[in-house]
Amino acid sequence: VSNADLLDAEQAGVDVEDGRVIVDEYQRTSARGVFALGDVSSPYLLKHVANHEARVVQHNLLCDWEDTQSMIVTDHRYVPAAVFTDPQIAAVGLTENQAVAKGLDISVKIQDYGDVAYGWAMEDTSGIVKLITERGSGRLLGAHIMGYQASSLIQPLIQAMSFGLTAAEMARGQYWIHPALPEVVENALLGLR
């Protein structure tokens, strides 16, 4: 939990709201020359988010404060999360309920690990991949995985969302190694209508 409210940051001209240092998309604070990143300023209390923000700050520190054309922005569109339990849980993007609440016309596919050769060989009866896409455009809206190596299996889905690949492009635009567990992602993609 951020403790920015305890830093007395206002003394340096740094604005704080709800216990967090306020930053813009370049990670700049309200005080000229002062950047912030990680738990002190981000609503995402995740190390990989802080790593991303650190790369943004590292680049932007070398730019003139007003030269936003040379700066890079922090991209928080598709922040993934993983829980390293047994089984692992990983997620990125919208849940089915969130997509419905936004009034989106969606397609949902739940694929069991045991439906692919690797999952069958592991005798996996609980692992699943759940994908949510926008019907019509095929745009991936969310991915949720529970099972062995969920934190690794979700990575290509994060990439697809970040780079704007549709479910069909991702499913058919590359080779999927057989027999390997990522085939469960391929089959989920192919099962979307």
Spans of features found by a protein language model:
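Short C-terminal domain-edge/linker segments immediately following a structured domain
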Residues: D24-R28, N51-H52, D64-S70, G138-L140, ...
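Solvent-exposed alpha-helices and their adjacent loops that cap or buttress functional pockets
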Residues: R28-T29, G33, D75-H76, M122-E123
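Alpha-helix initiation/capping motif
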Residues: N3-D8, I72-D75, D112
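Flexible, glycine-rich terminal cap/loop adjacent to redox cofactors
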Residues: V79, F84-R193
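FAD-site-proximal beta/loop scaffold in flavoenzymes
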Residues: V1-T68
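Rossmann-like dinucleotide-binding cores of NAD(P)H-dependent redox enzymes
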Residues: P43-N51, H59-Q98
